[in-house]
Amino acid sequence: MAVYCSEQKTRMLKNDTVVGQNMRAYLLSLLMITVSLAGCISNEDNASTDIGNTTEDDLVLPEWQIGDQWLYTFITPQFGEDSTRLVVADVREDDGLFMLGISSEGEAQRHAVINHNPFLGRVTMDGLSVYENGEPQPVFNFPWEAGNTWAFRLLGQDWSATTDNIYNGEVTVSASSTEGHQLSYVFSGRQGFIMSLLWADNEGVVNLQMSLIQKDTGYTGDVFFYRAGDLHDNLYEENDQEIYDSFFDEGYSPNEAWDTLVWYLDVEIDDKGGSGTLTISDQQDGSSPLSRAWGNGATEKGSFGTIPSKTGEHRITLTLQGETSFVHLKVAGALVRSWTL
């Protein structure tokens, strides 16, 4: 009997040991599953916070309406700091285009002659592509996705772009050009346009900065756009003799004349006995719609204006005295478009 009890006790102990081992294995498996699930949940949480509170609407093509407006600060080497308002002036459903104008006619003229604001005029409805050399350029890449790469042409450069980051509805893009220029901008899906932009050349000189001050809707007033074509761009330096040059006004096309010509001047006259004069004359009637004279040490930085467009040759006559004296003259033809909202 004693032997039997001992054997039973031995069996029970063995059974308890097996059960304990099985239980520990079960609990260990459960713990591993729990940790694994916690890791998955943690990874999902981290992935969702990588883009902050960005929504799907922030990543897709924004919907523009007539009267939408963005007030920007522009900084350029020629003009320093200036604020201007970009406005959706028209929606052309027939050809799939927005017309983006500017609330200042002077700013529209600046764009015509120095092209310092690339986001004026025609903008495609299917991607907010802007036009350069008559072709739409995909500056933006909807729907936004981090890591995407693409190419476009803007500001006279061919760019390779990358979507670097997306956070709280703002998309950061960087691009480099074949000539070593750098471009970066932040696009806001919630504001429907660019928050900031910076363009620097291959020497690190910042050619353009844009910063959004305010987004609004329901603009009322006049809006302008000068669609331009370059006619003349030359830098003249000190010369003991009169300088003669010319440019031709052949109109926008054989069937359409320019509405006006826009000129730009950047002038420095030597402060040691320097002087200078400039005249632009119409060869047909002999009129001189633009005349300038500068004395010792004079400067005229980034001035601009308009003269009548007359088909044919325009003659340029300059005098420049002084070792460091120079005149930079640019002329563009422009078709003038305006809207009243």
Question: Which sequence ranges carry the predicted segments?
Answer:
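Noncatalytic modules at the cell exterior or secretory-pathway interfaces
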Residues: 306-324
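Short, surface-exposed beta-strand/strand-loop-strand elements in extracellular ectodomains
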Residues: 273-288
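Secretory targeting signatures
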Residues: 1-72, 192, 224, 280, ...
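Non-catalytic, beta-strand-enriched accessory regions in extracellular/secretory proteins
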Residues: 235-258
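Edge beta-strands of jelly-roll/beta-sandwich modules across compartments, strongly enriched
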Residues: 274-276, 323-337
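Beta-sandwich interaction modules
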Residues: 252, 294-311
